[in-house]
Amino acid sequence: PTSGGIYLNPLVDVYGFPRGQDLSEYATNFEKFDENRNMPVQSWFTTPSEWTQNPYWVKNRILNNNKRYRALASLTANLKATDWLNLQARGNVDYVSDKFDQKMYASTSPAIVGNNGRYVYADTQNFLIYGDVMAMFNKHFGDFSVNAALGGSINVQTENSLTLDSKTASLYKPNLFTVPNIVMNTSASAEQVIDRRRTIQSVFATAQVGWKDALFLDLTARNDWSSTLSHTNSVDKGFFYPSVGL
């Protein structure tokens, strides 16, 4: 797939191609051998720039690769304590690894690519752990019925990522797309996230009180404590969500 935008969208170059020339000759001849550089470079009716490039070069010499690896696991345990009380515990684990790289060959628009090409490498890993426990109550008292649940949960998200982009800093060797070949100067970029974690702890309750199966009162309450509230005035009380319905 090819990225969008004025730099990398081949349709922009097709629309701007001179009407009096034959675009098809650039389809198979989108590159030509440069004796001075001893390698193939982009072939186009004019000098490639941020405004125009050979659309077939964009298609064949600007390459994106996305891969996702994922693993899921879940576990549920139930216990019927009495005829009117059930206990439940659940847990989920979700691991996601996203890997992306982009290869832009030398002689792509110099506005976005160094003289020897550009390489973008990104590796992101997310790890999610979720667990909850609940007690569920269902009982009749004469004309009254009570259906209620009380529980708590925890949600932990952890992220690690590394993104390297040679940008216009270029590569040491032309068209060699590896991380060690990136010229890591001030024109390049490197971003790393190590164990960025977000935790949400919650308690919740819900109840429905009925009378003769004709009138019902619904009550719910939930309180969340998020790690994003650390060092704020809300760190202890969190967020409270009540509701009442009749």
Which role fits each region the language model picked out?
Residues P1-R70, Q88-Q201, T228-V235:
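Surface-exposed loop/interface segments of Gram-negative outer-membrane beta-barrel transport/assembly proteins
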Residues A71-L75, F127-V133, Q201-A207, N223, ...:
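Hydrophobic, lipid-facing positions within transmembrane beta-strands of outer-membrane proteins
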Residues L75, A89, A148-L150, L219, ...:
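Membrane-embedded beta-strand positions of outer-membrane beta-barrel proteins
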Residues L75, L79, V209, D213-A214:
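Extended, hydrophobic/aromatic-rich amphipathic alpha-helical segments that build helical scaffolds
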Residues K80-T82, H140-G142, K212:
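Outer-membrane beta-barrel channels and translocator barrels
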Residues R90, I200, T206-G210, L217:
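Exposed, low-structure sequence patches enriched in small/polar residues
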Residues V93, V209-W211, A221-N223:
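Short, small-residue-rich loop/turn micro-motifs
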Residues D218-L229:
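Transmembrane beta-strand segments that form the barrel wall of outer-membrane beta-barrel proteins
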